[in-house]
Amino acid sequence: MRDPDALLVRAGVRGDPERDQHFLIDDRVLDRLPGYLPDSADTDHVLEIGGGTGALTDRLLDVADRVTVIERDPGLATFLTDEFADEIEAGSLTVIEGDALEVPLPDFTASVSNLPYGVSSEIAFRLLPEKRPLVLMFQQEFAERMAAEPGTDEYGRLSVTAGHYADVEVVEPVPKEAFSPPPAVESAVVRTTPREPPYEVPDDELFMRLVRAVFTQRRKTMRNAVRNTTHISGIEDAEAVVEAAGEDLMSKRAGNVPPEAFARLAAIAAEVDG
């Protein structure tokens, strides 16, 4: 495996917190990341977002038939193309220079990525609907919120929306010292295993809007949150929805409402509004 410190030297970069660049340099963490994919994961075509200097890329090439890297930094994309010229020529690696939020995604079978933290939420929710196994590095606080259960302080919109697409687990905390330069916060690795949600919703978009709406007023009862956020949820007759949903659900606060109850509320809203 290529040495991550040597890759930094060859690339001539040091990382730049102002540009959200923190390179993962801990060999042990790098070696473990591909192994966090579920046993059932298809590694025919693994997507990496934010290839950096290629330390993780190198390890993914060892377990995948093909790897595609999306790297937005032109200098690093050029470095990856030069550093892995043999792998590119052999057809096992493709390097795409561009923003992972804008470029078309390849037809990947799994993704393992150390995401740029500034856009990690946006990238995660571009990947999750693809229903592929994911192993992603996040800020620890974000990771814990993503995997949180109802009734906990961390539970929120992020927990419900991520859990709509997959089972979510925090599989490893990662200290600041694993990166160069060290970020200001601790990190964590999240594994998502895709599955259908254990409930039905009439419309994914309505479900997501409703969840987003009520969590903007998480300290209020669901009754008041539904009434006060129709400009976000798009619900036309909030009073009828509140009445149809019943006292048991409407007296709770969003942080104590499980995903299946949000699904039931979305179904009620769809029926009431026609």
From Swiss-Prot:
**Entry's InterPro entries?**
KsgA/Erm, rRNA_Ade_diMease-like_C, rRNA_Ade_Mease_Trfase_CS, rRNA_Ade_methylase_Trfase_N, rRNA_adenine_dimethylase, SAM-dependent_MTases_sf
**Entries under PROSITE patterns matching the protein:** RRNA_A_DIMETH (PS01131), SAM_RNA_A_N6_MT (PS51689)
Q: What is its EC number?
A: 2.1.1.-
Q: Output the Gene3D superfamilies linked to this UniProt entry.
A: Ribosomal RNA adenine dimethylase-like, domain 2, Vaccinia Virus protein VP39
Which family does the record claim for this protein?
A: Belongs to the class I-like SAM-binding methyltransferase superfamily. rRNA adenine N(6)-methyltransferase family. RsmA subfamily.
Task: Provide the binding site for S-adenosyl-L-methionine.
Answer: 22, 24, 50, 71, 99, 114
**Protein origin, superkingdom:** Archaea
Which HAMAP family is this protein grouped with?
16SrRNA_methyltr_A
Q: What name is this protein filed under?
A: Probable ribosomal RNA small subunit methyltransferase A
Can you say where in the cell this protein is located? Cytoplasm
Query: What broad class describes the main subcellular location of this protein?
Result: cytoplasm
Q: Which UniProt keywords apply?
A: Cytoplasm, Methyltransferase, RNA-binding, rRNA processing, S-adenosyl-L-methionine, Transferase
